[in-house]
Amino acid sequence: MAANKYTGTQTEKNLQEAFAGESQARNKYTYFASVAKKEGYEQMSALFLKTADNEKEHAKMWFKELAGIGDTKENLAAAAEGENYEWTDMYDGFAKTAEEEGFPELAAKFRAVGKIEKHHEERYRALLKNIETAQVFEKSEVKVWECRNCGHIVVGTKAPEVCPVCAHPQSYFELHAENY
């Protein structure tokens, strides 16, 4: 990704803080919406969600200014690096501190989440490799492909350019997986 024009300035720090603040507000408001819905306040839940969507757009605006959004390859690489930091440094350090301060249950949660973050990194790196080796929609062996729009199933080494049932483009195909 390109460097941002604010590098090293107070404005860059302000943009980073604005991005973090808007991102946190968005998440909080989605949690608050769930509580309001459970308590029977549909309108309030909807307003929390509407505001959360606004906060998401504010955060996106600041993140774009920071040149934080690239193409999919760049985004996958950045996501993998972020997940790597979380599991190798952040959560490990948090767990050690929690343990030292007498919070072993919280330390265990930090470590458990760290393991999940490691899986996230592996997933992003695998997806990045698929793009780099042109294997997103074509594999060396026969696979089962499913259209994410209509559910049409195709067996072969490559997803069709266009779904023969719903006419959606190849980008709607993924490897079919049963999880039940």
Over which residues does each language-model region extend?
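Non-heme di-metal
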Residues: 1-180
